[in-house]
């Protein structure tokens, strides 16, 4: 493959990644913990869209439990978003040197 073909392919890959990123900005995933007591909705940009806390989970005598539930819900949302990114980028991820997460 000559250098011009390589540059053309690189530009095509960059354009595809930009389109996928634009699509991902519209995606939202939901992380859940405690059987639904805590839910966190995360945008494709990894920005938190919303947090739901069931009143049952809010016990001022057990704040560490609530903290653990929030952390678990966030981590669940991040894992789902990473999986979504991998699925959308697919083979482009390896061509672009991997994903930054």
Q: Predicted segment positions?
A:
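Alpha-helix boundary/capping detector
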Residues: 36-39, 50, 68, 72, ...
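N-terminal intrinsically disordered, cationic/polar leader segments
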Residues: 26-57, 61
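Long amphipathic alpha-helical segments used for membrane anchoring, targeting, substrate engagement
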Residues: 1-30, 79-101
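Active-site- and interface-proximal helix/loop "cap" or "latch" segments in soluble metabolic
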Residues: 52, 56-83
